Amino acid sequence: MELEFLGTCSGQPSKLRNVSSLALKLLDELNEIWLFDCGEATQHQILRTNIRLRKITKIFISHNHGDHIFGLPGLLSTRSFQGDVGPLTIYGPAGIEQFVKTSLRISKTKISYPIKFVTLEEGGKIVSERGFEVYTEKLDHRIDSWGFRMVEADKAGELLMDKLAEFKVPNGPLLGKLKRGEQVELADGTVLNGKDFLGPAKKGRVVTVIYDTRSTPSIRRLADHADVLVHEATFDASEGKLARDYYHSTCTQAAETASACHVGHLYLTHVSARYVGSLASQMVKQAREIFPATTLAKDLDKFVVPMKG
């Protein structure tokens, strides 16, 4: 499981940062990549990575402002040129289906694969498949904006081969059943319960993505004990009033959330283009005074989400 930041700037692209997009790479787990937002030129950023468009199976859209969706038509069109790419699902606010279909219709773009749209209307579980769940809640922005919490199912503990050695279980189906915690009967009639030979279960990982919003209680519900919190930080600590007036967050508000929610690591994104050089360093310093495990993400940064334990 790996995060790759494709765009980390707010509002409009700068020379150093493109607008919002984040790839959650689940290649080892599902052989899939999930995208969170798709601002202008996201597919250009992807050309600078090892991401293949055919691997993108889900796109989660936080809200319908242009810096978060203008890259969709081009990316969807280019994905059609990749051959048999399989279906894709887009989760987003009311209006995202109309935006995509209108853009494709007016440009006479034909898509070679099915696209399913899931309109976000209320908070709750929106994905449950193959050991992963995604939850969403509404945030506090000028238009409907949604945050996302991805939860990986717990992993079974490792088979304790030393403990099992005395029973001389042969390689094959019986070992597989024991690894799954099932009961088996050996050739001599001995009955073994797989649960007796498994180490402690490994907690699944949690990744929370929060784009445009003011501080609001739903963020903390989504971020509770997340391994990784990706949180917008449009402004630094000195611009609290500006952040509130424009329905955005400061770096210290993101850090306060990370601290209160006991997250593993905080990645700041959606940063105003004004924060470069010493101003960017100052922003990180402000956040780290509250939550030391903070990183100001840059375009094309990659971060592995480690397993617990």
UniProtKB/Swiss-Prot annotation:
Record text on cofactor binding: Binds 2 Zn(2+) ions.
Residues noted as binding Zn(2+) 1 in the record, renumbered to the chain: H63, H65, H141, D212
Keywords noted in UniProt: Endonuclease, Hydrolase, Metal-binding, Nuclease, tRNA processing, Zinc
Catalytic activity: Endonucleolytic cleavage of RNA, removing extra 3' nucleotides from tRNA precursor, generating 3' termini of tRNAs. A 3'-hydroxy group is left at the tRNA terminus and a 5'-phosphoryl group is left at the trailer molecule
Tagged with keyword Transferase: no
UniProt entry tagged with the keyword Secreted: no
Superkingdom as given in the UniProt entry: Bacteria
Cofactors named for this entry: Zn(2+)
EC number(s) reported in the record: 3.1.26.11
UniProt-annotated catalytic positions: D67 (proton acceptor)
Gene Ontology MF terms in the entry: 3'-tRNA processing endoribonuclease activity; zinc ion binding
Gene3D superfamilies for this protein: Ribonuclease Z/Hydroxyacylglutathione hydrolase-like
Record-stated family: Belongs to the RNase Z family.
Subunit structure: Homodimer.
Function: Zinc phosphodiesterase, which displays some tRNA 3'-processing endonuclease activity. Probably involved in tRNA maturation, by removing a 3'-trailer from precursor tRNA.
Protein name as annotated: Ribonuclease Z
Source organism (scientific name): Lactobacillus delbrueckii subsp. bulgaricus (strain ATCC 11842 / DSM 20081 / BCRC 10696 / JCM 1002 / NBRC 13953 / NCIMB 11778 / NCTC 12712 / WDCM 00102 / Lb 14)
Gene: rnz
